[in-house]
């Protein structure tokens, strides 16, 4: 999957695939690193990769829970959300 410039360029479904690729360690080491760095960059969430590897509270580490956490944090901090579609 081609990585996009910002979180607003992704639908939730598209971004879920990136999270699944990270969780499942898909691709070679460089691809895994690129996906993780991209996740951290576009989400802008202060917990970064901990959202996946060390989830807290109601986040069970599933792709759906990670997306929910990102959406809630971005909305609470006046940041744009995912592309509709």
Curated annotation (Swiss-Prot):
Disulfide bonds: none
SUPFAM superfamilies: Colicin E immunity proteins (SSF47345)
Keyword match Aminoacyl-tRNA synthetase: no
Record-linked CDD domains: Col_Im_like (cd16363)
Protein's UniProt name: Colicin-E8 immunity protein in ColE6
Gene symbol of the encoding locus: imm
A Pfam family per the record: Colicin_Pyocin
Assigned protein family: Belongs to the colicins ColE2/ColE8/ColE9 and pyocins S1/S2 family.
Keyword Phosphoprotein (UniProt): no
Keywords: Bacteriocin immunity, Plasmid
Molecular function terms from GO: toxic substance binding
Protein species of origin: Escherichia coli
A GO biological-process term: bacteriocin immunity
């Amino acid at each position: 999957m081609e990585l996009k410039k910002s979180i607003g360029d992704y639908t939730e479904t598209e971004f879920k695939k990136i999270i699944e690729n990270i969780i499942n360690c898909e691709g070679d080491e460089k691809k895994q690193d690129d996906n993780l760095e991209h996740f951290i960059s576009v989400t802008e969430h202060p917990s970064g990769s901990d959202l996946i590897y060390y989830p807290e509270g109601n986040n069970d580490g599933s792709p759906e829970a990670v997306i929910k956490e990102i959406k809630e944090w971005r909305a609470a901090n006046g940041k744009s959300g995912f592309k509709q579609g």
